[in-house]
Amino acid sequence: AWVQRRLQMGDRYGMHLHLFHDYVESAGVTLRKEPNWGDNGTGYGVPLAAYTKDEQVRLIQYGLDLLFANGVPKTTLFRAGGWYANLDTLAALEELGFTADSSARTKYTFGRNKLPGYWDISPTMKPYYPSRTNQNRENPANEFPVLEIPDNGADSYAYSAADMIKRFTLNLGDGILTEPQQVTYLSHPHWFDDKEQARVRELFTYIARYNNADDHGPVVYSKTNVIADQWSN
């Protein structure tokens, strides 16, 4: 009911998937426990990309079916748990009719096992359609029809306010913007403690200096689905 109320108010949602063991088994997919970035045996740390393309289709479709069965309409937005999306993930999203993904980020390792990810984009990367052979690059002649909206502003759990402000200033540049740019920040509400809230307040206090609504600069706050519509082919 809460989700439905938010949708009625104009909010949109995207699917964010972690592969807990009971979820994978309920989806009818053979369970995998490796690779794992480090969890307590629940499957939370097993990346979606550990599974084949066809398995990923089944896992994602199962989640869509569960949502629909509980009165939540299908979404066309996605972000992989731990950002672990690969070319098979993008192919699965294409097959299932997703229009945008927000898993792309700068190069990283994650978790106590320091599992490397598949992304290696610039912090100033704009939304793009990934190449079918290199998800970190564009290739208009051979691209996925799934718009990649990079998580280029970093996340408030692992990064300091100064780090996130630096990402903003890199994307803002030194002069007048001559074309659109976007910066996406990520937070995890279930561990959004006082320290993290303070980092976010510091970040957005800084960004507010450039608010377009106050005639101070180019900053307009938006939602992922709006960005997807504005940047789509």
Regions found by a protein language model. Name each.
Residues 1-86, 144-145, 153, 180, ...:
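Metal-dependent polysaccharide deacetylase catalytic core of the NodB/CE4 family, i.e.
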Residues 77-180:
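Active-site-adjacent pocket scaffolds in enzyme catalytic domains
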Residues 100, 163-233:
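C-terminal domain-boundary segment and adjacent tail
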Residues 48-62, 160-167, 195, 199:
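Soluble or luminal CAZymes and related metallo-dependent hydrolases
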Residues 21-26, 84-89, 108-112, 157-158, ...:
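Short catalytic/ligand-binding loop motif for oxyanion handling, primarily in non-cytosolic enzymes
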Residues 16, 103, 152, 222-227:
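Conserved beta-strand termini and adjacent loop/short-helix elements that scaffold enzyme active sites
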Residues 4-7, 70, 86-99, 205, ...:
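Short, surface-exposed basic-aromatic patches at helix termini and helix-loop junctions that form
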Residues 2-5, 62-69, 134-135, 167-174, ...:
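A generic secondary-structure signal
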